[in-house]
UniProtKB/Swiss-Prot annotation:
Pfam families according to UniProt: peroxidase
InterPro entries: Haem_peroxidase, Haem_peroxidase_sf, Peroxidase_pln, Peroxidases_AS, Peroxidases_heam-ligand_BS, Secretory_peroxidase
GO process annotations (BP): hydrogen peroxide catabolic process; response to oxidative stress
This protein's encoding gene: PER57
Statement: the UniProt record of this protein carries the keyword Ribosomal protein: no
Its job: Removal of H(2)O(2), oxidation of toxic reductants, biosynthesis and degradation of lignin, suberization, auxin catabolism, response to environmental stresses such as wounding, pathogen attack and oxidative stress. These functions might be dependent on each isozyme/isoform in each plant tissue.
Molecular-function GO terms, alphabetical: heme binding; lactoperoxidase activity; metal ion binding
Inducing stimuli: Positively light-regulated during the firt stage of development. Up-regulated transiently by a cold treatment. Induced in shoots of plants subjected to a long Fe deficiency stress. Down-regulated by salicylic acid, a plant defense-related signaling molecule.
Gene3D superfamilies in the cross-refs: 1.10.520.10, Peroxidase, domain 2
Record's catalysed reaction(s): 2 a phenolic donor + H2O2 = 2 a phenolic radical donor + 2 H2O
Protein's recorded name: Peroxidase 57
Cofactor binding note from Swiss-Prot or TrEMBL: Binds 1 heme b (iron(II)-protoporphyrin IX) group per subunit.
Compartment annotation: Secreted
UniProt lineage: Eukaryota, Viridiplantae, Streptophyta, Embryophyta, Tracheophyta
Keyword Iron: yes
Taxonomic source organism: Arabidopsis thaliana (Mouse-ear cress)
Length: 313
């Protein structure tokens, strides 16, 4: 039944992204590098055992890569003006994990598995390790040959709900997808500077944001006295579940855009459905991740298969 459900979901997505899915497929490396997904999974599992926050880090990396020129690993390039140097990418980490995975794959199957697919697969595996869904995802992406920090225009935490949703709909997704992907904040961490005004002087009023639970204000103040970051899901910060949605319905959203999801007419009904049904949220999250993983991908003879994820060939 599960295999049929996965096939059905991918069939629907094929018609949504016909060009991308024409050359992406589940098991793309089954002949050329049959151990590829096992190598990725084992190294991610090792990292997760030491640093459970790897899930949040890889989700952030995958999102930031896909939403700038597509899922092409352009974020991984080291240079003085690459995407990696742009302000919004300053908090992206776990590049060293991608390097280790790439090194093992190159030893096993030289010039075969793209860095773009490594990021996609590693993110998928880290979500499952954190208690999220296990799912199949198409592979066959190729790596981009361009990485420019001027192309990075990712939104900040005060973006409106309509603005956030439009980022996803402009990429071929819908509102359910947008809210599901923002639900990845269930394992996220936020720099205290991103919400400091909400707990001190909201919009220059000298008082905290009235839409935030006062108990959360106090808790975040204490956290930010001793740490530069705070969990975006204060209930189960290392567990991939629907607690994030339950929290924002209780006025316990840490980022302003997260809290707005629970009250905006465009998204509050979806938030309620995800909060009330963890299985439904996880199914929708899988659909959204597969869609996002097909955004503006390079396939066939386009792009390249990098030998080192930090450098163009």
């Amino acid at each position: 039944m599960m295999k049929g459900a996965k096939f059905s979901s991918l069939l629907v997505l094929f018609f949504i992204f016909p060009i991308a899915f024409a050359q992406l497929r589940v098991g793309f490396y089954s002949q050329s590098c049959p151990q590829a997904e096992t190598i990725v999974r084992n190294l991610v599992r090792q990292r997760f055992g030491v640093t459970p926050t790897v899930t949040a880090a890889l989700l952030r990396m995958h999102f930031h890569d896909c939403f700038v020129k597509g899922c092409d690993a352009s974020l991984l390039i080291d240079s003085t003006n690459s995407e990696k140097t742009a302000g919004p990418n300053g908090s992206v980490r776990e590049f060293d994990l991608i390097d280790r995975i790439k090194a093992q794959l190159e030893a096993a199957c030289p010039s075969t598995v793209s860095c773009a697919d490594i990021v996609t697969l590693a993110t998928r595996d880290s979500v499952a390790l954190a208690g999220g869904p296990s799912y199949s995802i198409p592979t066959g992406r190729r790596d981009g040959r361009v990485s420019n920090n001027l192309d990075v225009t990712l939104p900040g935490p005060t973006i409106s709900v309509s603005g956030a949703v439009s980022l996803f709909t402009n990429k071929g997704m819908n509102t359910f997808d947008a809210v599901a992907l923002l639900g990845a904040h269930t394992v996220g961490q936020g720099n205290c500077g991103l919400f400091s005004d909400r707990i001190t002087s909201f919009q220059g009023t000298g008082r905290p944001d009235p839409s935030m639970d006062p108990a959360l204000v106090t808790s975040l103040r204490n956290t930010c006295r001793n740490s530069a970051t705070a969990a975006l899901d204060q209930s189960s910060p290392l567990r991939f579940d629907n607690q994030f949605f339950k929290q924002i319905r209780k006025r316990r959203g840490v980022l302003q855009v997260d809290q707005r999801l629970a009250s905006d007419p465009q998204t509050r009904g979806i938030v309620a459905r995800y909060a009330n049904n963890n299985a439904f949220f996880k199914r929708q999250f899988v659909r959204a991740m597969v869609k996002m993983g097909a955004v503006d991908v390079l396939t066939g003879r386009n792009g390249e298969i990098r030998r080192n994820c930090r450098r163009f060939n």
